[in-house]
């Protein structure tokens, strides 16, 4: 049983080897032909040797060698098949990764060379871009100036044409009229033009006056600001002493009677006798009202309703006379 199993194994191995040889011979047929032409003598010798070996009876050692070779070749074929199946199992992802790594290595190798060679070209291109940008800016500025000049010229032409058209229209409108009416119409036009010119001058004067007022107000505000800053500095200083408050109205009142006294001293003694010196009336703090007082007598009607008829008529006549005087003289009613 052991011999039969070994024979079957040997037969299967020999079959596999023959198949492998056929495949290898079909793939390398072209190479073998060229090689056979060059070295025909050697092939003939090897063939004769192989024929002699086949004719001779095979020994036991030869069979052993063949078995060993077939086993080694079969193990090599199985290894190759396994490696192929593994590579197929890896699939496209492995190939893509390998191609990417190769491309990266190529780029990394090629970059320093490009940098070393392209420094001068980068400088020249940078200079060119600078000069081009400057030229573009200059062209844009020139184009803007030309457009502005063309606009100004167009406006001047339009105004000139309008004036010419107005004068032509006036002449065409006055041709059919008699000379007296033409003179009147021209006078009216001249007066209208003068009125327009006066209005324009007045508007200019108003604008100038407003500008002056604004300047004066700004100056006044500046002076007030400076004064305020100085007062704040004086208050914040160490030498500041607190004083009682005095309103500006009281200061003005005290200044006015002093001026009156000076005028009386300059005038004669007769005026001094005629006009006695004015004395200020001191105001009592108790007389200053601190609250509003209402006159409520708990009455339902106004007291004027309880006046007699004659008194009411007299008051009404007096009111009418006052209103009439206001209308005639323009004086307000007291």
UniProtKB/Swiss-Prot annotation:
Bias-annotated ranges (Basic residues): 14-24, 35-50, 78-118
Tissue and organ distribution: Widely expressed. Expressed in brain, spinal cord, cerebellum.
Gene: RSRC1
Function: Has a role in alternative splicing and transcription regulation. Involved in both constitutive and alternative pre-mRNA splicing. May have a role in the recognition of the 3' splice site during the second step of splicing.
Protein name: Serine/Arginine-related protein 53
Superkingdom, taxonomy of origin: Eukaryota
Region Disordered, annotated ranges: 1-179, 201-220, 243-290
Chief location: nucleus
Span of the signal peptide: none
Cysteine pairs bridged by disulfides in the record: none
Localization per record: Nucleus; Nucleus speckle; Cytoplasm
Biased composition (Basic and acidic residues): 1-13, 51-62, 132-166, 201-218, 247-259
